[in-house]
């Protein structure tokens, strides 16, 4: 709730969305619905992600449609566990390289997101290089989630200006979200600030974006607001040092409290 109030305050305080008015206009109730509607039109936020096409979760055909190959044993097992899960919790997937852990994680995210009513995912990786490397694959998966609507995506780390894929996506998002452009994934300018990065539906970035939610800092509840409705995927967790693990343990407690 605190994060939502901060977000609402920032929007309401922006004179582009709510232009200043004369003092003699204050108190006229008939003016406010029009001002709010104008602000909503100017904000033009993307739609919300609604995961899952099938009531039964994900079968082999849908998996192949998502990723271009039939599920292997590790993906079958992961999907079966996710489909039999009732309450949100922590899932640990450990396997050798090349077996498709990323695809298994995204398939589980889609299934668990449908069960929990989640509105997005956060995919945390140890370095900018690994986040950049995975970004095209996440885009391909996310594009299939947004065939009929415009959904927001964000690459979150300190050097996104050097990522060509992301910069091309920003250029393609310069048109209005409501217009009929080909790309269904958009980078919305309002969510480009570092404090609001996690509010987008699909976020892939360095793990520090998640760990900062465990710090005592201003506007930290905006990060909590973004995480509370997501499926959170943490990759290469074995590579984190004891210092990072201290913050990870704290944020996992928060995520558990939010039933993430």
Report the location of each language-model feature.
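Pre-Walker A (Motif I) flank of P-loop NTPase domains
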Residues: 86-92, 118-120, 199-200, 260
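SF2 helicase catalytic motif II
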Residues: 220-258
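Walker A/P-loop
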Residues: 87-109, 240-241
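Inter-Walker segment of RecA-like/P-loop motor cores
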Residues: 145-213
């Amino acid at each position: 709730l605190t994060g939502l109030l901060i977000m609402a305050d920032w929007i309401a305080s922006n004179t582009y969305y709510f232009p200043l008015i004369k003092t003699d206009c204050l108190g006229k109730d008939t003016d406010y619905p029009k001002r709010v509607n104008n602000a909503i039109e100017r904000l033009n936020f993307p739609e919300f992600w609604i995961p899952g096409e099938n009531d039964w979760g994900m079968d082999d055909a849908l998996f192949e449609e998502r990723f271009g190959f039939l599920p292997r044993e590790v993906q079958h097992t992961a999907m079966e566990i996710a489909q039999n899960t009732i309450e949100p919790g922590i899932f640990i997937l450990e396997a050798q390289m090349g077996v498709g852990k990323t695809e298994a994680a995204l398939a589980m995210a889609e299934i668990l997101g449908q069960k929990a009513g989640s509105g997005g995912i956060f995919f945390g990786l140890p370095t900018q290089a690994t986040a950049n490397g995975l970004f095209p694959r996440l885009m391909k998966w996310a594009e299939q989630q947004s065939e009929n609507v415009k959904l927001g995506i964000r690459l979150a780390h300190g050097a996104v200006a050097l990522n060509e894929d992301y910069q091309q996506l920003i250029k393609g998002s310069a048109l209005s979200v409501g217009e009929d452009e080909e790309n269904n994934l958009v980078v919305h300018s309002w969510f480009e600030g570092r404090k609001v990065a996690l509010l987008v539906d699909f976020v892939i970035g360095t793990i520090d974006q998640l760990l900062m939610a465990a710090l005592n800092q201003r506007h930290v509840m905006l990060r909590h607001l973004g995480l509370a409705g997501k499926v959170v995927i943490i990759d290469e967790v074995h590579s984190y040092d004891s210092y990072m693990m201290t913050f990870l343990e704290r944020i996992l407690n928060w995520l558990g409290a939010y039933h993430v």
